[in-house]
């Protein structure tokens, strides 16, 4: 292998994740001069990027600007560190796109990442890489690959709850039913924004992280019981509405359903308590990235 790195990279609208366990909020603050804090600081092409703040706007076509590539560099740096490579690294990426626009954007997304002699600095350490190859895989299906043997001989639903979209499709005997692929504009960020708006009516301002903690049953700060009840009720309504919409698209919840994406992990308790879903399997937020790497390794062995 030498200086070669294979990396599964999930460029989510909410978080950027890798097969090696790296995760960061998909956003940055850009400046022309060095900021006060050097934490998570990327320096690339003479610009300074504080990674993890100011979430990027939603882009179905991520090749229209450099934002996704910028967010990918710290993720690659993490993989270089894990591999303990000190010289220039040759990187082969496995990335993904939602199934609904996989065919139209696949070629463009692959070419977007292919670059030679990329130099950058992250967290006060310099890196030099060549991205020598990039393969693009269907998002959601890639996560199923991590548990493929459990579902290869049956029909199952796959529901990927992401930041901005909920992507759904069926897989039968290991093959995607392309006629069942849909993307709903109802990702977890819409729930959080609605909760924030509702709480503002009572002059309560909660951060996204605080709301997520309350949904998970944690106690980030002491709030009145009615605040938590509002969040609980709205989250339950969101889950039931999503499941009802999915049923309207012809999905049968008597079949096993695989939930993937960070939103699924956040909502797991509510999904499990729903009377709609008979059997649910939950894959963690790194499942797509891990699946990309598995598919990449399989493809390169052929």
Residue ranges and their predicted role:
Residues 203-206:
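Short, basic interhelical loop/turn and adjoining N-cap
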Residues 168-173:
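PRPP/pyrophosphate-binding module of the type I phosphoribosyltransferase fold
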Residues 198:
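A contiguous pocket-lining binding segment that forms or flanks enzyme active sites
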Residues 1-157, 175-190, 209-302:
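Nucleotide/phosphate-binding catalytic cleft detector across ATP-hydrolyzing
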Residues 161-167:
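Ser/Thr-glycine-rich phosphate-binding loops at phosphate-binding pockets of nucleotides
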């Amino acid at each position: 292998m030498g200086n070669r790195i294979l990396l599964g990279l999930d460029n989510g609208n909410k978080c950027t994740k890798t097969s090696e366990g790296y995760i960061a909020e998909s956003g940055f603050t850009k400046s022309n001069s060095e900021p006060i804090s050097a934490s998570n600081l990327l320096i690339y092409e003479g610009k300074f990027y504080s990674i993890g703040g100011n979430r990027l706007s939603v882009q179905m076509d991520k090749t229209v600007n450099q934002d996704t590539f910028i967010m990918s560099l710290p993720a690659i740096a993490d993989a270089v560190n894990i591999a303990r490579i000190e010289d220039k690294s040759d990187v082969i990426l496995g990335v993904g796109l939602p199934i609904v626009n996989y065919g139209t954007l696949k070629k463009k997304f692959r070419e977007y990442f292919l670059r030679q002699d990329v130099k950058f600095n992250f967290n006060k350490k310099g890196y030099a890489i060549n991205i020598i190859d990039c393969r693009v895989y269907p998002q959601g299906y890639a996560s199923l690959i991590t548990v493929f043997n459990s579902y290869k001989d049956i029909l199952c639903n796959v529901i990927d709850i992401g930041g901005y979209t909920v992507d759904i499709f069926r897989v039968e005997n290991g093959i995607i039913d392309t006629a069942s692929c849909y993307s709903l504009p109802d990702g977890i960020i819409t729930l959080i924004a609605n909760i924030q708006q509702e709480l503002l009516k009572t002059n309560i301002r909660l951060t996204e992280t605080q709301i997520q903690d309350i949904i998970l049953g944690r106690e980030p700060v002491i709030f009145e019981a009615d605040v938590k009840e509002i969040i609980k009720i709205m989250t339950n309504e969101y889950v039931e509405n999503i499941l009802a919409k999915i049923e309207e698209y012809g999905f049968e919840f008597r079949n096993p359903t695989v939930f993937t994406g960070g939103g699924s992990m956040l909502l797991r308790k509510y999904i499990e308590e729903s009377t709609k879903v008979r059997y649910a399997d939950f894959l963690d937020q790194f499942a797509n990235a891990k699946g990309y790497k598995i598919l990449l390794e399989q493809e390169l062995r052929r």
